[in-house]
Amino acid sequence: MKVIHKLNRTVSLVALSLAMLIAPLQAAANRHPAKPDRRKPIEKRRQSNNSTRADRRRAEARRRAEAARLAAAARERAAEEAMREQVQAMIAKDDISGEDPEIRRIAVNALGDHAGTVVVMNPKTGRVYSIVNQQWALSEGFKPCSTIKLVTGLAGLNERVIDPSNTTAISDSNRVDLTHALAYSKNEYFQQVGGQVGFSKMISYARLMGLGEKTGINARNESAGRVPISKTGFAVNHMSSHGDDFKVTALQLATLVSTMANGGKLVTPFFARTAQDETRPTAKVRRIVNIDSDSFQQMIPGMIGSVSYGSGKRAFDPQATVAGKTGTCIDHGTWVGLFTSYAPLNDPQIAIAVIARGADGRNHFPAAVAGRIYRDLNSRLGVSGNIDIASKRPANPATSVADTDTDTDEEEADAGEVVNDTSSTKVNSNKPVWGDQRKTAESKIKRTVMTLPSRPTQPAINNSPNQRTGRVSGRQ
């Protein structure tokens, strides 16, 4: 018992001693609370810092990009405004002697304060009724963009490369014929045609239609424009749909389409500045172009289709049939829009070419300008409102390819007009390629054109040594 008693006493003393030792430590701890652990994982802190810095960098990059975008937009607006002011100053300097006052007023109002030029002439006689912004129309060369397809189409038809009765594969699942290709300005179609016609033949037809030479108008400072000197490989194809390395004036476009309207006479345009000019009985013809009359006829349905339901529908005139071709692309860093046309179909009295630059070159503004002029001239042209069946639009144009194929169709899809335009309208084995309404309109246009008076047949251009043979047909 004594041993146990001593042991208990010893334990008590030890416990008391420990309590006396711990008490000061606890008091000190209460006076100085433990500091938080500063040893946070270094990697975690580093990741957090990196993430914060990255967020700041991204935010700064977005801010700078937005600032750059706004600055670029401001510069573009300033440049557009300066160009429009410059154009208005040019128009004020136009020599209007020999112009038709009423037609000039209509053309000036149609162009408004936009940066562009307008040519209105008689496709049969060559008389120029008005040129708004004569400096641009006579002296300034523009890339023709898709208006070059008029030359490509004529070359393909005359060289028997195009079979207008057949469709052509322009992608794995899309087929079009000449009428559809012209109406919607299909690049691949005309690239195939140009590649088969060949470079030298393409240039021969371009020169034949008046490109690369002065028109001979009785006005100063006319430019001859430019045609390409040499191209090989796919560059020939691309040139045939985009007009690469061509330079054309608005007056050249007007005389080109006049040649198509009058059946193959390349007339010399003129201002009626003398009494002799006023009473000139016949046109001064530079040459009769050696293109078969059927080739001109076969181009007409696509040109009417362009205006009635295609890329040039902003020129649509509900009282008269207009045949035309659009063009849109980038030339020297700025947008260029073109439209060349004639009307009425059965008795062409007016040819109009419009070219616009900058923002005004987009959205087929030139076609809208021409359309306004045609509509304002209807009474003068003797159009009574009995519209030719050829110019009727589909009843529901919102369902047509024109609203899915955006010259924006293929023309504005990229900076230089697209090389490979894949239409959003594809061939489906269970559905027709085109809507029934548009298909009916195209059929009526073709039937109407077949009833037009035939024109004298001219001998074809002789084949060149590098001429490739073959037809654009459904077997491609």
Residue ranges and their predicted role:
Residues 69-122, 205, 211:
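Beta-lactamase-like hydrolase cores
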Residues 236-244, 248-272, 278-285, 309-384, ...:
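Active-site beta-strand/loop architecture of penicillin-binding DD-peptidases
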Residues 28-93, 380-476:
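Compositionally biased, proline/threonine/alanine/serine-rich low-complexity intrinsically disordered stretches
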Residues 116, 170-254:
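Active-site-adjacent helix/loop patches that line small-molecule binding or acyl-intermediate pockets
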Residues 107-110, 126, 140-165, 181, ...:
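Active-site SXXK
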Residues 3-14:
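Bacterial N-terminal signal peptides that target proteins for export
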Residues 12-22:
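Bacterial N-terminal signal peptides
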